[in-house]
């Protein structure tokens, strides 16, 4: 099993959700996060005053999948989230040793 974490632009979340649904991914966890990378925040003017916002709003989407689904899911996320502009985000893939479905106590791939 692997966990895919994707940090994406908020307005791309629905596209990513639909893309994952189309390949059979049935669930995910989504969090509102803030961060910066090469984009390095942005400057705004509010009521005549200029200020810098270092951390930009992003969405963090997490899914845990069987190894056989990971490549297709990562590709679907990239395709759906990509705008071609700076700040599109990142996808991280890491191993998951175990999963337990609390309600049924199923373990491993049966739990995801």
Describe the predicted segments one by one.
Residues 1-112:
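Positively charged, small/polar-rich N-terminal and surface patches that mediate targeting and assembly
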């Amino acid at each position: 099993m692997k966990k895919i974490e994707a940090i994406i632009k908020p307005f791309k979340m629905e596209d990513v959700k639909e893309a994952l649904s189309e390949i059979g991914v049935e669930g995910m966890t989504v969090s509102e996060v803030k961060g910066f990378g090469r984009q390095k925040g942005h400057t705004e003017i509010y009521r005549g005053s200029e200020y810098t916002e270092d951390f930009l709003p992003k969405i963090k989407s997490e899914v845990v999948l069987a190894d056989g689904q990971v490549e297709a899911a990562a590709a679907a996320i990239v395709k759906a989230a990509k705008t071609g502009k700076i700040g599109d985000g990142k996808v991280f893939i890491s191993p998951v040793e175990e999963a337990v479905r609390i309600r049924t106590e199923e373990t491993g791939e049966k739990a995801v």
